Amino acid sequence: MSGFTFKQFHINQNSCAMKVSTDGILLGAWADVKHCKNILDMGSGTGLLALMLAQRTEENCQIQAVELDPIAAKQAQENINNSVWKNRIQLIQTDIQHFLQTTAQTFDLIVANPPYFEQGIACKNEERELARYTKQSHLNWLEWAATRLSENGRISFVLPYDAGKTLIKSTALFCIKQTNVITKIGKTPQRMLLTFAKQPQVLMQDQLVIYDADNQYTEAFIELTKDFYLKF
């Protein structure tokens, strides 16, 4: 698929290793953007999350999107330039750990759709391997993000269900929101949307089912994503 058109922006992705996915769309629609003035997108890929969050936030909210792969970063910049939010999103082509160690900025919201899989059989495409396989643990990603999180800020990830459970147990941060994502009613959860904070809060837990028994989108999924998908 060379491109993906949403209601208010278009994503070109022919040069990007990892394409627009339901996981990314869920995170971009689900993350809590209240009171956000500065947002960080870790591992921006096509620029999808940065653009979704720009659509959902006020004009005074600035977004920094960091992407290591120069080819993906170039295409993400093109996608940003073609949007109405190009003056609110800054694309930075660098390693996320280096960026977090050198920036003085703190963020009210940090989002990531990190590489899911442990290093395994090499992909034929080096860029796809970089995007698909993690050489760092998800805990590392979370701990890096926490170093630049504002005192009342939030970190939101989308992860495989088991990886999400492991991360909750491993971190010293507080999990304040957890949504278990079920592809079809009656199935077990496959993904987990998570929000972490420095300060303890009452944990909000729920689930999101994408398809009902008739393979139709559920009302909950439509409600969450209707501002983005053309079909809703």
UniProtKB/Swiss-Prot annotation:
Gene3D superfamilies: Vaccinia Virus protein VP39. SUPFAM superfamilies: S-adenosyl-L-methionine-dependent methyltransferases. Pfam families: MTS (PF05175). The keyword Transferase applies. It catalyses: adenosine(37) in tRNA1(Val) + S-adenosyl-L-methionine = N(6)-methyladenosine(37) in tRNA1(Val) + S-adenosyl-L-homocysteine + H(+). Its main location: cytoplasm. GO terms for molecular function: nucleic acid binding; tRNA (adenine-N6)-methyltransferase activity. It is found in: Cytoplasm. InterPro entries: DNA_methylase_N6_adenine_CS, SAM-dependent_MTases_sf, Small_mtfrase_dom, tRNA_Adenine-N(6)_MTase, tRNA_adenine-N6_MeTrfase. It is an enzyme of class 2 (transferase). Disulfide bonds: none annotated. Its EC number is 2.1.1.223. One of its GO terms (biological process) is tRNA processing. The keyword Transmembrane does not apply. CDD domains: AdoMet_MTases. PANTHER family: TRNA1(VAL) (ADENINE(37)-N6)-METHYLTRANSFERASE. HAMAP family: tRNA_methyltr_YfiC. Belongs to the methyltransferase superfamily. tRNA (adenine-N(6)-)-methyltransferase family. This is tRNA1(Val) (adenine(37)-N6)-methyltransferase.
